[in-house]
């Protein structure tokens, strides 16, 4: 096993490495979105190298990261991350609405996303939701819940990733397919010190009560009776 403890550079962002590897052969380490959030994992490259990734705790691998470079053979081990597409909901329009309308829409949007158990991150007046079902179904959920006035589109996950902090990337892309993960939806109003309204996914449980969650990432294994 080859131990990888440091990232040498990034062939997609660093001009020096772009020039150095211009004619190199890439041995890709292909990771899905969950694997990319781990600072420690073991996986083989496309050419069969047994790689043990052991990075600092808060270091996250990015698409194009160079993990190893052999000048003699002109071969570089490079990370390729396959991210899910993302639905982007634009909340800017809500700034023109009354406070009551803003609160109502944010609550209803959080409830709709929460009932679907879709992960979500809000940033810069947008909501990012990774695709876990067909786009037609996500489109249907938005329209049947009356959110036609909120523009939304579908983009590649790689387009959204640079806008996110490491913790936001872990929340959005780390295990997006887990249906028991709660949704966190914040206010469309950007406050300088993180203040403002925060609306979270709400769940109705078999024991007859419902609840919302504070702003933290956690998983629960329990049965739900959803009310739509």
Curated annotation (Swiss-Prot):
GO MF term set: nickel cation binding; unfolded protein binding
Lineage top rank: taxon: Bacteria
Annotated InterPro entries: UreE, UreE_N, UreE_N_sf
Keywords: Chaperone, Cytoplasm, Nickel, Nickel insertion
Ranges of biased composition (kind: Basic and acidic residues): 204-228
Region Disordered: start-end pairs: 193-228
Sequence similarity: Belongs to the UreE family.
Protein name: Urease accessory protein UreE
Source organism of the structure: Yersinia rohdei
Lineage: Bacteria, Pseudomonadati, Pseudomonadota, Gammaproteobacteria, Enterobacterales
């Amino acid at each position: 096993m080859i131990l990888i403890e440091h990232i040498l550079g990034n062939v997609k962002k660093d001009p020096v490495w772009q020039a150095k590897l211009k004619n190199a052969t890439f041995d890709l380490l292909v990771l899905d979105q969950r694997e990319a959030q781990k600072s420690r994992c073991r996986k083989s490259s496309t050419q069969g190298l047994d790689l043990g990734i052991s990075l600092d705790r808060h270091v996250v691998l990015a698409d194009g990261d160079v993990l190893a470079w052999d000048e003699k053979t002109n071969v570089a081990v490079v990370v390729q991350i396959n991210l899910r597409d993302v639905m982007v909901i634009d909340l800017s329009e809500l700034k023109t609405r009354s406070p009551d309308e803003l609160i109502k829409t944010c609550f209803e949007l959080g409830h709709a996303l929460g009932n679907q158990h879709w992960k979500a991150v809000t940033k810069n007046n947008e909501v990012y939701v990774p695709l876990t079902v067909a786009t037609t179904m996500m489109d249907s959920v938005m329209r049947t819940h009356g959110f036609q006035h909120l523009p939304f589109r579908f983009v590649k996950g790689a387009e959204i990733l640079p806008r996110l902090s490491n913790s936001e990337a872990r929340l959005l892309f780390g295990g997006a397919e887990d249906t028991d993960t709660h949704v966190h939806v914040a206010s469309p109003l950007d406050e300088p010190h993180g203040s403002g309204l925060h609306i979270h996914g709400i769940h109705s449980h078999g024991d007859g009560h419902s609840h919302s969650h504070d702003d933290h990432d956690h998983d629960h294994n329990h049965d739900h009776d959803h009310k739509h």
